[in-house]
Amino acid sequence: MIINAKGPASFAEKYIVRSIWDNKFPPGSILPAERELSELIGVTRTTLREVLQRLARDGWLKIQHGKPTRVNNFWETSGLNILETIADLNPEGFPVLVDQLLSARTNVSAIYFRGALRYNPDTAVDVLAKIHQLEDTAESYAEFDYLLHHTLAFSSGNPLYVLILNGFKGLYSRVGRYYFTSSDARLLALNFYKELEVLAQAKNYLDVPALMRTYGMNSGKMWLQLRDDMPASIAQYN
């Protein structure tokens, strides 16, 4: 098992998570005793204890006082916060993970974009006004796209959408910086922003779902043209 880590705690965390992913520690199994596991990994018991607590908070493990630590089925117990970890664990499946991520974000964003234009159209107008000074670079587009989604999610009348979006942030930001290296992708996005701005100025939230659906289909086709050339390093979060 080859693990790149920045320190003992990072190494221990990646070792345990990789072992769970590879079914060395399968769901429902009991982790080795603390002393045995710390010797196996090569870290102090104090470091291991901190790592186990962190992994339990993320849903990988179940820790109960006086009982051995049990491995969870992370698909049932974890949240969006492990997306980055899954990408790092399974680089071969990363393009499919991104497909699923983009599909999920498109479906959810249609709801909060409509909500924002319905309940806070002036906020939508203000953030969309920034497109007229948007630099034609991948970095600028990726940053603005996240700003737009974050602002409209918060203004939709249901701030829980912001928490969902935050779960996508790190992974989506890296993918976005790659996606927007395409001038065609930037032009497609700019036209979408302009159409959305017109709807916001008119306080027309009813036509948002149709616009989102069209842009989702077109950007999905664009992504399929770009994803095979995506650098493998994008899957790595540290």
UniProtKB/Swiss-Prot annotation:
Q: Which InterPro entries does the UniProt entry name for this protein?
A: FA-response_TF_FadR, FadR_C, TF_FadR/GntR_C, Tscrpt_reg_HTH_GntR, WH-like_DNA-bd_sf, WH_DNA-bd_sf
Subcellular location(s): the record lists:
Cytoplasm
Q: Where is the HTH gntR-type domain?
A: 6-74
Q: Which GO terms describe its biological process?
A: fatty acid metabolic process; regulation of fatty acid metabolic process
The UniProt entry's GO CC annotations, sorted and at most eight, read: cytoplasm
Keywords from UniProt, A to Z, are: Activator, Cytoplasm, DNA-binding, Fatty acid metabolism, Lipid metabolism, Repressor, Transcription, Transcription regulation
**What Gene Ontology molecular function terms does this protein carry?**
DNA binding; DNA-binding transcription factor activity; fatty-acyl-CoA binding
CDD domains to which the protein is assigned, alphabetical:
WHTH_GntR (cd07377)
Q: Which residues bind DNA?
A: 34-53
Q: What does this protein do?
A: Multifunctional regulator of fatty acid metabolism.
User: What is its quaternary makeup?
Assistant: Homodimer.
Record-linked HAMAP family:
HTH_FadR
Name listed for the protein in its UniProt record:
Fatty acid metabolism regulator protein
The gene name reads fadR
